[in-house]
Swiss-Prot record:
Catalyzes the rearrangement of 1-deoxy-D-xylulose 5-phosphate (DXP) to produce the thiazole phosphate moiety of thiamine. Sulfur is provided by the thiocarboxylate moiety of the carrier protein ThiS. In vitro, sulfur can be provided by H(2)S. InterPro entries: Aldolase_TIM (IPR013785), Thiazole_synthase_ThiG (IPR033983), ThiG (IPR008867). Pfam families: ThiG. The lineage of its organism: Bacteria, Pseudomonadati, Pseudomonadota, Gammaproteobacteria, Chromatiales. This is Thiazole synthase. GO terms for cellular component: cytoplasm. Belongs to the ThiG family. It comes from the Bacteria. It catalyses: [ThiS sulfur-carrier protein]-C-terminal-Gly-aminoethanethioate + 2-iminoacetate + 1-deoxy-D-xylulose 5-phosphate = [ThiS sulfur-carrier protein]-C-terminal Gly-Gly + 2-[(2R,5Z)-2-carboxy-4-methylthiazol-5(2H)-ylidene]ethyl phosphate + 2 H2O + H(+). Keywords: Cytoplasm, Schiff base, Thiamine biosynthesis, Transferase. Pathway: Cofactor biosynthesis; thiamine diphosphate biosynthesis. Disulfide bonds: none annotated. The active site is at K106.
Length: 264
């Protein structure tokens, strides 16, 4: 492990992580491919849709916990498929029961099936309820800086604005809003949704995001395991570029070689 990796950790809810890439576990052809892709990504936090993935709800069926053991990964149960605050809160409480008191959750409350944009009113309501109920909430939201700050003030441990619609692969559509959110946040900011390829992930990190969560960008690739590896490298490169500080943009050229002191 490099000195940079040792000193530059992602901290969420009081726990440190080396990897700034968080990955989903859906859309793979089988659990073996899921395991291989997660391992290639280097991710330490994996998110799971409680309403769609078996983590003990259905005894006798393949269980994600068998291929991605919770003593090796931090599970992040999410409320994918919920369209009301009530459903989201109920799903988080079910996850807490299934995972023996686990309180770190990813909250998402969707507005409609076409865009899968977050319903911000329902999201705010669910976040308030869950925080009061002792949950550590990582929240999926729009790229509205005011809303992001409000969710932070409610007590969410991380705010996760979308780059583009879920599963669209369009990349970051509004860099300036993401930058505004990052610059005013006191909690980790992770881009969630819309990443399509490695360069999208690198850009998010170059903007100063603390991490990126993705699923479809890896699972829907022609070679998911190879794409997972590419995303790992992109996250690391983007983070190092952010820490290094990019050169200022200039309108005109600037010669790389000095004019003074030439031989002729």
């Amino acid at each position: 492990m490099s000195q940079t990796e040792t000193q530059d950790l992602l901290t969420i809810a009081g726990r440190d992580y080396r990897s700034r890439l968080l990955v989903g576990t859906g859309k793979y052809k089988d659990l073996d491919e899921t395991r291989a892709a997660v391992e290639a990504s280097g991710a330490e936090i994996i998110t799971v849709a409680i309403r769609r993935t078996n983590i003990g709800q259905n005894p006798g069926e393949p269980n994600l916990l068998d291929v991605l053991p919770p003593d090796r990964y931090t599970y992040l149960p999410n409320t994918a498929g919920c369209y009301s605050a009530e459903d989201a809160v109920r799903t988080c409480r079910l996850a807490r029961e299934l995972l023996d008191g686990h309180t770190l959750v990813k909250l998402e409350v969707l507005g409609d099936e076409k865009t899968l944009y977050p319903d911000v009113v329902q999201t705010l309501a669910a976040a308030e309820t869950l925080v009061k109920d002792g949950f550590q909430v990582m929240v999926y939201t729009s790229d509205d800086p005011i809303l992001a700050k409000r969710l932070e003030e409610i007590g969410c441990v991380a705010v996760m604005p979308l780059a583009a619609p879920i599963g669209s692969g369009l990349g970051i559509q509004n860099r300036y809003n993401i930058l505004e959110i990052v610059e005013n946040a006191q909690v980790p900011i992770l881009v969630d949704a819309g990443v399509g390829t490695a360069s999208d992930a690198a850009i998010a990190m170059e903007l100063g995001c603390d991490g990126v969560l993705m699923n479809t960008a890896i699972a829907a690739a022609k070679n998911p395991v190879l794409m997972a590896s590419a995303m790992k490298k992109a996250i690391e490169a983007g983070r190092e570029a952010f820490l290094a500080g990019r050169m200022p943009r200039k309108r005109y050229a600037s010669a790389s070689s000095p004019v003074e002191g030439t031989f002729f």
